[in-house]
Amino acid sequence: MFSMVNGFRNYSQQAIQASRYIGQGFIVTLDHMNRLPMTIQYPYEKLVPSERFRGRIHFEFDKCIACEVCVRVCPINLPVVDWKFKKDIKKKQLKSYSIDFGVCIFCGNCVEYCPTNCLSMTEEYELSTYDRHELNYDQIALGRLPISIIEDRTIESISSFDFSSKKIMEEHSKSRTVTKFLD
């Protein structure tokens, strides 16, 4: 009889423990139901990158003095600077400048160390192509400013995105900027 009471007690303790586990699972499920989704439907919605996002490099031809600092600080010696020396003014004159974004690691060293600030990072991150040779940008392609997602009339901004918090993922789940194409 004593073993039957112990068996019933063990069974009831296991049933209570199982119901606790199920309750904890329901709490986690209900907690996740109130959160915003972490993913977006990419072609139709776009995230607005943060202010310090390192996207495609923008180049201003008129500001460049052909000092080649960008080539020296680049970990892969990527920027190709072609110049000729003008003897009458005793200065270098820039002939061409190009960067191959198929090889670029977007470290930002060239932008940071440029003495004339002729290089800057843009918000553009959509650089995919079917031909890798199209990723080799010359000074004309580098000089074009990208159309900002915020200024594009075919895309609608939904809410704000904040990368400045220490709890990036927590803030990401609470408030973010998502853009949506207008129908």
Swiss-Prot record:
Sites where the protein binds [4Fe-4S] cluster 1: C64, C67, C70, C114
| Domain (4Fe-4S ferredoxin-type): residue spans on this chain | 55-84, 95-124
Query: What PROSITE patterns does this protein map onto?
Result: 4FE4S_FER_1, 4FE4S_FER_2
InterPro entries this protein is in? 4Fe4S_Fe-S-bd, 4Fe4S_Fe_S_CS, NADH_quinone_OxRdtase_chainI, NDHI
Q: Which residues take part in binding [4Fe-4S] cluster 2?
A: C74, C104, C107, C110
Q: List GO molecular-function terms, semicolon-separated.
A: 4 iron, 4 sulfur cluster binding; iron ion binding; NADH dehydrogenase (ubiquinone) activity; quinone binding
Reaction equations catalysed: a plastoquinone + NADH + (n+1) H(+)(in) = a plastoquinol + NAD(+) + n H(+)(out); a plastoquinone + NADPH + (n+1) H(+)(in) = a plastoquinol + NADP(+) + n H(+)(out)
Provide the protein's localization.
Plastid, Chloroplast thylakoid membrane
Q: Which GO terms describe its cellular component?
A: chloroplast thylakoid membrane
Which superkingdom, per the lineage?
Answer: Eukaryota
Please tell me whether the keyword Membrane is annotated for this protein. yes
This protein's membrane topology, according to the annotation, is: Peripheral membrane protein
Free-text comment on the cofactor: Binds 2 [4Fe-4S] clusters per subunit.
NCBIfam families xref list: ndhI, NuoI, PRK05888.1-3
* Family classification: Belongs to the complex I 23 kDa subunit family.
Q: What is this protein called?
A: NAD(P)H-quinone oxidoreductase subunit I, chloroplastic
- Species source reads Anthoceros angustus
- Gene that codes for this? ndhI
